[in-house]
Each structure stands twice: as structure tokens, then as C-alpha cells.
Design a protein with these regions (language model features):
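Acidic/polar, glycine-rich intrinsically disordered N-terminal extensions of enzymes
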Residues: 1-73, 77, 81, 101, ...
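Alpha/propeptide regions of enzymes that mature by internal proteolysis
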Residues: 1-46, 51, 73, 89, ...
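Conserved phosphate/anionic-ligand binding catalytic regions in large, soluble enzymes, centered on
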Residues: 60-84, 178-186, 252-278, 358-367, ...
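Flexible, glycine/charged-enriched surface loops at secondary-structure junctions
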Residues: 33-34, 100-106, 143-156, 200-212, ...
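Solvent-exposed alpha-helices and their adjacent loops that cap or buttress functional pockets
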Residues: 55-59, 66-68, 106-109, 150-151, ...
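Glycine-rich anion/phosphate-binding loop at the beta-strand->alpha-helix junction
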Residues: 179-181, 186-331
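C-terminal catalytic subdomain
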Residues: 276-280, 288-388, 392
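Small-residue-rich
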Residues: 45-50, 54-166, 170-174
Length: 424
């Protein structure tokens, strides 16, 4: 059944729930969970963290009509920032018309490290460790046999000498973690390897730990957008495309711009990571390290022009070692619901959706910046927050926002005064 999302953003909260039910996007059980606003319980929260005194909520939204590799998705977003969902929805709709996103997973492995120091003969130690690679991989797999049964496990091992104030001999373990992110898995394997590596190197082990710089879990998303989709006026569409390509170059050249450029990308990525129960801090750390791989901090996405085909071409590659199993994913009702909304994707499929949405978010931001300016769409949503802060009820928000925008006055004192006038 073809789903129509026309006017979804204009509907009331209740009408949106009714549309989800009518289109059977969720199982009856999950539909009920959503309608009853079922959240993680304090009892469960108390087992997940420490010193718990309650739970904390954020807006839960949907970005419809996201086309990735020919498959259409309804993507859950968790974010409190105004205009992020609107921008993602706008961009995804344009990109869908242009053919959607193409995404691919280059590899799906995690990397862990054992750092050795006080190694008297690093070259000899390196040779010894490499010569025992097969035995070390077997030992790692014995430490976590369940992943081997699921088709994963330790796949490779290499050694590097790191020169510095203190010299380190670092052993890198590459592990196929299947559907899990694999932090506990990697750390368990590395702990098992430490005493053997100390013996082989005749050195001391400083630590064994997963790395969040997941260069073995790279995902690329790309899209091609004809100039005509950027504006109703052909010449203006080309001009916008040219400016977006220049904005991309600016983010490659200037770290001050790159930081904001990448923050905008993560407006979308973090929203999905949170919704799907993934560790957004780990993903951000790895991506920002990846943005600095050439020795200076750069924008993660690139937009170029294909003048022959009259298209704007976007592409982004970054580490995306997300999980669909493990951690707290199965314990939070809203996270379980998110996975169902997406069609219960595999970890690889989810990674492709997430990177595509990061590129979508970036498209929307750059297009706004080089044309209407970022504030035009952003301000109306910011003013809604101001109206709520002033104490407006649901029925009072729209007229108060309209008045504030008309008067171009955006402060709490004025909003409260206008609200009093509205009520009198």
C-alpha cells in the first residue's frame, strides 16, 4: 500500500497517531505503546544507571519518505532542537524525487588495542606477535565464543610502533561483531590477550580497550540532485547548486566552519542514534577523529557539481558502527518501537540509513544558508518555543507566534505581554 504523507506536519498529535494506525506502520502492540506514551520505567532505569531519581523525555518525531537504495523508510528522530525534523523532511522529499540515496557499507568490524610499553626490543617483539597471529586470534575467540556461533569473531591482528615521549608497541585486534556494537566483546577479548602479549613482547601492558575510531566500519552515502529540484527557476537552481558546492569547499578549508558544518550533520545522525538506542557519543568521537584524518579538521560531507548532467552531487563517508542488538536496545520500549518503524533493519542497513540522513540534514542546512538564510525557517520554530515558555496553551501558541513574527520582537517579556493582551 502506497502511503501518503501529505500534510502530516499540519496535523494534530492525535491525527498523526490515527494516520499511523490507519496505515498499519506499527504492530497493534507498538501502536498502543506509542498512544499510551510508554517510556522506560524507573525500575529499569535504576538498573541501567546509578543514583537514579527519575527518567527524562525528549520529543519523538518521524521523518517520512526517506529513500535509501530503493527502499523507503519512515525514520524516527529524537531531538528537542527546532527545525531539525522539518529540515530533514524537506530535504529527504527533494532527494527522493531526485532518485534517493545510494549507500554502501565498506566493512563492518570493530578495532581494539592493547598498548604495551617498556618493550626492550620492539622489532623482535613485533615479529614474535605477528608470528603467533593465528593462536592469538583463536585465544580471542575462546574468550567470547558466543560471537563465533553467530558468525562473527576475531578476524585479524596487526602491530604498530608508536614513537613519543614514551614508546608504545600497540597490538590492534579486528573483530566482526555482527549486530552488536561490541564494546564488551572487544574488551573481554583484549583482556584475554594481555598476559600472552606481555610474555611475547617482554613488556608491560598498559591497557586493553575498544577504539571508537572505527575505520573498519566505514559507510558511504551519496545522492545526485538535478538543478531543477533546487528552485522553480532553472538559473536560480544552478546558482544555488554552485553556492552549495562553494559552501562545501569552505568547510574543507576552515575548521571554524567545519565544526558547525559537522554539527549540522549530527543534528540528524544523533537524533536517529538516540531513537534506536545507540551510543551517539561513541559515533561522534569516531566521526570527529575521521574528520581530522588528514591532519586538520574538515567537513565530513562533500558537494560537487556535475555540469554535464546539471546535477549537484553529495557524498559522505564516516565510521558508523551501530548496533541492533545488545546494550539497552531491548529494554527501552521507545527504542524497540523505533526499530520496528524502520522495518527491524540489520546493523549494516541501519548504518546506511543513518549516514544518508546525515547527508540529508547537511543538504537542507547548506541550501538554506546559501539562499534564504538559516533563520527564516528556524525562527518560526524558535518563536514557538518562546510562546510555550511565556505560558501559552496549545490553542494560544499559533496566534501568539503570528503576532511575535509580525512585530519582529522575540523576547520573553514581550511574549508575555502579548499573551496577556490575547487573553483579555
Amino acid at each position: 500500500m502506497k502511503i501518503s504523507w501529505n500534510g502530516f506536519s499540519k496535523k494534530s498529535y492525535q491525527e498523526r497517531l490515527e494516520q499511523l494506525q490507519a496505515q498499519a506502520l506499527l504492530s497493534p502492540e507498538k501502536q498502543t505503546s506509542l498512544e499510551q506514551d510508554e517510556q522506560i520505567s524507573v525500575t529499569v532505569a535504576d538498573q541501567l544507571s546509578e543514583n537514579v531519581v527519575g527518567t527524562f523525555s525528549l520529543p519523538y518525531s518521524l521523518v517520512p519518505e526517506v529513500l535509501v537504495n530503493g527502499q523507503e523508510y519512515t525514520v524516527p528522530y529524537v531531538t528537542e532542537e527546532p527545525s531539525v525534523v522539518a529540515a530533514a523532511s524537506y530535504a529527504s522529499k527533494i532527494i527522493k524525487r531526485a532518485g534517493g540515496f545510494t549507500a554502501q557499507v565498506h566493512e563492518r568490524q570493530m578495532i581494539g588495542q592493547v598498548a604495551l610499553y617498556q618493550v626492550a626490543n620492539p622489532e623482535q617483539a613485533q615479529e614474535k606477535i605477528v608470528s603467533k597471529k593465528a593462536e592469538l586470534l583463536e585465544l580471542a575467540n575462546q574468550a567470547y565464543p558466543s560471537i563465533v556461533k553467530r558468525g562473527g569473531g576475531a578476524r585479524d591482528l596487526h602491530v604498530e610502533q608508536i614513537k613519543g615521549e614514551t614508546d608504545f608497541l600497540v597490538v590492534y585486534l579486528h573483530v566482526d561483531t555482527q549486530e552488536a556494537m561490541g564494546a564488551n566483546m572487544l574488551n573481554t577479548m583484549l583482556e584475554a590477550l594481555k598476559p600472552v602479549l606481555e610474555e611475547l613482547s617482554q613488556g608491560q601492558s598498559l591497557m586493553g580497550i575498544l577504539s571508537n575510531y572505527a575505520t573498519d566500519s566505514l559507510v558511504t552515502a551519496s545522492c545526485r540532485i538535478a538543478f531543477r529540484y533546487l528552485s522553480r527557476q532553472k538559473d536560480q537552481g544552478r546558482e544555488i547548486a554552485e553556492k552549495m558546492a562553494l559552501a562545501s569547499q569552505f568547510a574543507q578549508a576552515d575548521p571554524y566552519r567545519a565544526a558547525t558544518h559537522n554539527k549540522g550533520i549530527f543534528n540528524g545522525i544523533d537524533a536517529i542514534l538516540i531513537a534506536t538506542g545507540n551510543d551517539w557519543r561513541a559515533i561522534e568521537a569516531g566521526a570527529h577523529a575521521f574528520a581530522s584524518q588528514d591532519g586538520r579538521y574538515q567537513g565530513l560531507s562533500r558537494w560537487t557539481l556535475d555540469l554535464e548532467r546539471e546535477e549537484l552531487v553529495g557524498e559522505m563517508t564516516l565510521p558508523m558502527p551501530v548496533a541492533t542488538k545488545g546494550g539497552s536496545i531491548g529494554l527501552n520500549p521507545r527504542v524497540v518501537l523505533s526499530h520496528e518503524l524502520l522495518g527491524n533493519p540489520s546493523a549494516k542497513e541501519l548504518a546506511q540509513i543513518i549516514v544518508s540522513m546525515g547527508l540529508s540534514q547537511n543538504f537542507a542546512a547548506l541550501k538554506a544558508l546559501v539562499s534564504t538564510g538559516i533563520q527564516q525557517g528556524h525562527m518560526k520554530l524558535q518563536v514557538k518555543s518562546l510562546a510555550l515558555l511565556a505560558g501559552a496553551s496549545e490553542s494560544e501558541v499559533a496566534p501568539l507566534v503570528e503576532r511575535l513574527i509580525a512585530e519582529k520582537t522575540f523576547n520573553l517579556e514581550t511574549a508575555q505581554r502579548y499573551l496577556e493582551n490575547l487573553r483579555s
